[in-house]
């Protein structure tokens, strides 16, 4: 399948044109602002300056708490099982048995 078969002929594409007017019933108050207030006058300049000065203090206070909230990962340590002292003897017996069986098969 070619790209032209998949997407179709470029001549059959429809072009989009922007509408010339807003839909009926559209008002400026629907944007979230009151019609009498503008976005620039919503906050007084003094409050914006105070908020800007308070932000570094807020982050400085929160940083130690942020790092303390994460619990530490547990450390897993593999421990050897308690030995009764006869593992060396069992390994020696097994090696001797293997040696005897091998010599028995050869001779």
Swiss-Prot record:
Cross-link (Glycyl lysine isopeptide (Lys-Gly) (interchain with G-Cter in ubiquitin)): 13
Residues bearing the modification N-acetylserine: 2
Keywords: Acetylation, Cell membrane, Isopeptide bond, Lipoprotein, Membrane, Ubl conjugation
Annotated Low complexity bias: 35-81
Topology versus the membrane: Lipid-anchor
Matching InterPro entries: CYSTM1-like, CYSTM_dom
Region Disordered, residue ranges: 1-86
Residues in the signal sequence: none
Primary site of residence: membrane
Cell compartments where the protein resides: Cell membrane
Domain of life: Eukaryota
Biased composition (Polar residues): 1-18
UniProt keyword annotation of Cell membrane present: yes
GO-annotated cellular components: cell periphery; cellular bud; plasma membrane
Miscellaneous notes: Present with 2250 molecules/cell in log phase SD medium.
Annotated family: Belongs to the CYSTM1 family.
Protein name: Lipid-anchored protein YDL012C
